[in-house]
Amino acid sequence: MLGLLGLLGAVVAGLAFDSGSDPREDERESQDTPEGEAWDVSAAYLGFGEDEDAGTDHGGTEPDGQPISNDIPTPTDPDRDLTGTAGADQMTGGSGQDHLTAGASDDYLDGRAGDDSLDGGAGQDVAHGGDGDDGLAGGDGDDSLWGDDGQDSLTGGAGNDVLAGCEGDDTAQGGAGNDLVSGGAGQDQLAGGAGDDTLLGGEGDDRVFGGTGADEVDGGAGNDTLWGAAPGAADTDVDILNGGEGDDTLHLGAGDYGHGGTGADSFTLQDFGPGAPLMQITDFDPAEDDLVVIYDSALHPDPQLSLTAGNGATLLLLDGVPLASLTAGSNIDLAAIRLQAA
């Protein structure tokens, strides 16, 4: 299980540094223009602000050999507001706060510098936020969204999407479909939404929600908080939670697997009543880990916990009903387990 998550993390990293053809090398804005209309041709679209030599001092030297400064400011692009068509658009922003809206096809959007808004619409879209705090939306279709630098917000929509926050404190929502969501460096908040998703917190103290479906959630380095489903949701799909490095908190629902990893971890078990699948914790260490059972006071007015030995594990029971299987490096004492009303 952990090998799969590591492999998927490598896939995300590899995609981010793909050396193949990249439409950003073309340095082009969208050439799709609605019939009967024309783009507003301004200095920005004629190349001002795109010249790497803009603002260079050509003032010569003083008699003492010191350079003369003309104090020429480097031109910056105005905010770009581009709307594509039903065709396959290539849209590039500048250094301002750009708004790029593509149509219903397989589009490429690159916000570049500035706090940009990118909307791919329907289709299999690729969008890069670039530097700045960007908002990216994929819409329907199997989209790839990259926040790049900055505190970015990514929304995949329907489809099997790849969302990568990259650098910064990012938020990412997969939506419907089997999504791959990666936070990267920073304190990220990730949600898979509906579908069987894989979520990778990366470096930093992350909050990661699997959502509905059978999800795999990996916190990575940092003190992370992981949920297989939305808090309190009666989701019986089997989720796999791995805390990774750091002191992590794992919230398990019915049938979920939890592995804290290195560090002093906390496991929270949500009771869903008789008949719910057993939760399993594979590395509970009573010497350093914490275990909390959340119960319904209407179903359990006077809750009692008990333990019984199993095949290589310890079975935890609530009012005589099996709740979870615990694999521990040493004997477990009930004093190490806390009860908490929902």
Residue map of PLM features:
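Low-complexity acidic/polar repeat-biased segments
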Residues: 1-44, 306-342
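N-terminal segments that cap or nucleate solenoid repeat domains
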Residues: 25-112, 117
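Short beta-strand elements of solenoid repeat domains
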Residues: 81-83, 90-95, 99-104, 108-113, ...
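Feature marks extracellular polysaccharide-active and adherence modules
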Residues: 229, 253, 270, 282, ...
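Short, surface-exposed beta-strand/loop "edge" segments at domain boundaries and coil↔beta transitions
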Residues: 257-259, 299-302, 321-326
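Long C-terminal tail modules that include membrane-anchoring/sorting signals and adjacent low-complexity
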Residues: 263-268, 275-278, 290-292, 316-317
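Acidic glycine-/aspartate-rich tracts in secreted/extracellular proteins
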Residues: 272-275, 285-289, 293-300
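Short beta-alpha junctions and helix-cap segments that line functional grooves
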Residues: 277-279, 303-305
